[in-house]
Amino acid sequence: MSAPSPHSALDIILERMAAAAGDRPMPQLLIVAKTQPADAIARVAESLRARAGNEGHVAIGENYVQEALAKQPALGGLGLEWHLIGHLQSNKARDAAAAFDWVQTVDRPKLVEALARHRASAQTPLNVLIQVNIDDEASKHGCRPEDIGALAADIAARPELCLRGLMAIPAPDPDMARRRAAFQRMRGLFDALVARHASVDTLSMGMSEDYALAIAEGATMVRVGSALFGARTANTPPPFPADPMSSEST
């Protein structure tokens, strides 16, 4: 059986998201566009915008700064909201601060300082999520839960940045009960951050294989790529050299 088209897949994803949310507000769908050409992104973005009840910006997630920069000229007229969801090295902060509306992978003070320094005063504040290494994986980036408070205070003190919440990628455990527990821990950390910072409203967690579970546990944004476009094949290399510790946010 062939995989559903992106348009059919989009309908399935939105239905599952709504069912998982129940009577809570519909979470935002972030379209993960890693390795996808600009024309494919445009078609899905237009389909999402056309769906009944889809209000606000269509959000596009990219893992690599260079890949986003290469695609943005062709997509500039669509009013897309660009999110960086891959690990950001400090030497790429200048380009990221200029090109993205959100950076979801802030995990250290040096990066906070660099993004604030390079965000132009003519731009609106850069929306920032703190990436949390919720399962304490050596192979993943992200701050420790106990470091969230200090990092959040640093971000909130900088007018060039806007603290919006938390992001996490739990360990890819086949036991969904353990993933649920990780999502629940993230929800607890998020609720604590909401109580301290009025700007916080976003909990980004859940990907193609577990977005419904993440929504059930309180995600306000899910990052979906392979469930929408189809799985990337093993012979499809990343468009840019991969960080060996880079997160796979699909």
Q: What is each model feature region?
A:
Residues 218-222:
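Conserved acetyl-CoA-binding loop of GNAT-fold acetyltransferases
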Residues 226:
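Glycine/alanine-rich phosphate-binding loops at beta-alpha junctions
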Residues 1-209, 215-217, 229-231, 241:
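Conserved alpha/beta-domain cores
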Residues 235-250:
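Active-site loop ensemble at the mouth of alpha/beta enzyme cores that anchors a bound cofactor
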